C-alpha cells in the first residue's frame, strides 16, 4: 500500500487511508487538514480539520465537480501555515486526481506535466482513464478561472509551486528514458513498446472513456516507472 505519504509541495501531501490514521506520520509531517476522498470517508481525529468527499474509483464518476471545493480547502490550509494530506483508499487514483487539479490551478501547468512531476516522488500515482479525461476537460482555461477565484478570495498566490514542480520533471523523464544514450537499449525499447501497448488500451473516445482499463494493464501502467525511479534514487 506504499511507503507512507508523499510530499508534493510545501503544505501538500498525498497518501492512502493508512497514512490518514497513522499518528506518527501525521505528527511528523504536522498535518492539520485532511481531504478524505473515497466511498465512506469519516473523521478520525479531533484535532484535524476534514473535508470528506464520497467518490468511488470508477471512470464514470464525475470527480471534476469536487475540484473547486477541494482546491479552496487545500489552498486555505496552506495559506494559513497548515499542512494538508489528500488521501483516498490506495493513494493512487482519486487523491492523485484532486492533487493534480489543485496544482494545475496554482501553477498553470498541464495535468500531464503535474502527473509526471508527482510520479518522480510517488511512482504509483495513476488516475483512472475517466479521471484523466476529466482533468483534460478541466484544462488550462478552467484551472485559471479557478485560480482567479482563489486570488479574489485569498489574495495573490505567494507560493513558488511551478518552480518546485518543474524541478522534478527532468528526474522522472530520465528515469523513464534510462541512462542518457542516443540509441535506446533493448530493455528500453521493450519497455517503450509495452507502454505503447498500454496507451492503446486507454480509451480515447468520450464513450470509451467510461470503460474501465483492464486490471492487469492498470497495474502495469501504475508501476511502469517504479523500478527505474528506485534504481536511480538508490544509485545516488
Swiss-Prot record:
Chief localization: membrane
Enzyme Commission number(s) of this protein: 3.1.3.16, 3.1.3.48
Enzyme class: hydrolase
InterPro entries: Dual-sp_phosphatase_cat-dom, Prot-tyrosine_phosphatase-like, Tyr_Pase_AS, Tyr_Pase_dom, TYR_PHOSPHATASE_DUAL_dom
Biased composition (Low complexity): 181-194
Keywords: Cell membrane, Hydrolase, Lipoprotein, Membrane, Myristate, Protein phosphatase
Lipid linkage positions (N-myristoyl glycine): 2
GO molecular function: phosphatase activity; protein serine/threonine phosphatase activity; protein tyrosine phosphatase activity; protein tyrosine/serine/threonine phosphatase activity
Gene Ontology biological process terms from the UniProt entry: negative regulation of transcription by RNA polymerase II; positive regulation of ERK1 and ERK2 cascade; regulation of oligodendrocyte differentiation; signal transduction
Superkingdom per UniProt: Eukaryota
Active site positions, chain numbering: 88
Membrane topology: Lipid-anchor
Compartments (UniProt record): Cell membrane
Tyrosine-protein phosphatase domain segment(s): 4-144
Residue ranges of the region described as Disordered: 178-213
Annotated GO CC locations: cytosol; plasma membrane
Catalytic activity of the protein: O-phospho-L-tyrosyl-[protein] + H2O = L-tyrosyl-[protein] + phosphate; O-phospho-L-seryl-[protein] + H2O = L-seryl-[protein] + phosphate; O-phospho-L-threonyl-[protein] + H2O = L-threonyl-[protein] + phosphate
Its biological purpose: May play a role in the regulation of oligodendrocyte differentiation. May play a role in the regulation of myelin formation. Involved in the regulation of Erk1/2 phosphorylation in Schwann cells; the signaling may be linked to the regulation of myelination. May dephosphorylate MAPK13, ATF2, ERBB3, PDGFRB and SNX6.
Family recorded in the similarity comment: Belongs to the protein-tyrosine phosphatase family. Non-receptor class dual specificity subfamily.
Stated name of the protein: Dual specificity protein phosphatase 15
